[in-house]
Swiss-Prot record:
InterPro entries, sorted: Corona_5a (IPR009404)
Protein name in UniProt: Non-structural protein 5a
Organism whose genome encodes this protein: Avian infectious bronchitis virus (strain M41) (IBV)
Length: 65
């Protein structure tokens, strides 16, 4: 199972910069074209994915309790 943890962390380390780049591009589009509904919805989805990535990356494998 240790290899699976390493694999997941490797995927997360590649996926996180991609999400951050998408968020930067989307924020630029929102600034240029105004806060359209679809752009705002896509931004919420990206932020949700980033939240999940950070929870997976920074949550300890063992419970603290």
């Amino acid at each position: 199972m240790k290899w699976l943890t390493s694999f997941v962390r490797a995927v997360i380390s590649c996926y996180k910069p991609l999400l951050l780049t998408q968020l930067r591009v989307l924020d630029r589009l929102i600034l240029d074209h105004g806060p359209k509904h679809i752009l705002t919805c896509v931004r919420c989805v990206i932020l949700f994915q980033l939240d999940l990535v950070y929870r997976l990356a920074y949550t300890p494998t063992q419970s603290l309790v």
